[in-house]
Regions:
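Extracytoplasmic/secretory-pathway segments with low complexity and glycosylation-like composition
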Residues: 1-5
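Positively charged, low-complexity intrinsically disordered leader regions
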Residues: 6-36, 40-123
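Conserved small/polar residues in nucleotide/adenosyl-binding loops
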Residues: 127-129
Length: 129
């Protein structure tokens, strides 16, 4: 019988988020400020997001953004997420490829959304919100 579940160790939790825009040859057009119709500036996002999140959102040059240690420690509650081999799907597709999915049900809320929400809460805590 083949292994269906693959569990990574805590030491394998990522240390940086990947920002794909930094590696794109053809970068997306800038987001326009709805009032001025000019390209949005980082500061325009401050009423909605913390400075840390705003900076990441507007960052088009750094491919890797370090995950703060405090966030990585909290990720350990449910990460790394188990990888599960989808042998039934492989068989249904009649493919020699190995297909895997991340089992996000081990997260306290049963989805990946907490990964982003936790980081946003962390950056807001830095400005005492």
């Amino acid at each position: 019988m083949s292994t269906k579940k693959f569990l990574l160790e805590e030491k394998d939790i990522p240390t940086a988020w990947y920002n794909i825009v930094a590696d794109m040859k053809n970068k997306p057009l800038p987001i326009l400020n709805p009032q001025t119709k000019q390209p949005l500036k980082e500061e325009d996002l401050y009423p909605l997001f913390s400075k840390g999140v705003s900076h990441q959102e507007m960052n088009t040059t750094d491919a890797w953004i370090e995950i703060p240690d405090e966030v990585r420690e909290l990720y350990k509650v449910w990460r790394p997420t188990p990888l599960v081999r989808a042998t039934g799907l492989e068989k249904a597709l009649d493919t020699p490829a190995h297909i895997y999915f991340k089992n996000e049900s081990v997260s306290p809320i049963g989805s990946h959304k907490l990964n982003s929400a936790l980081a946003q809460a962390y950056y807001l805590s830095l400005i005492h919100i």
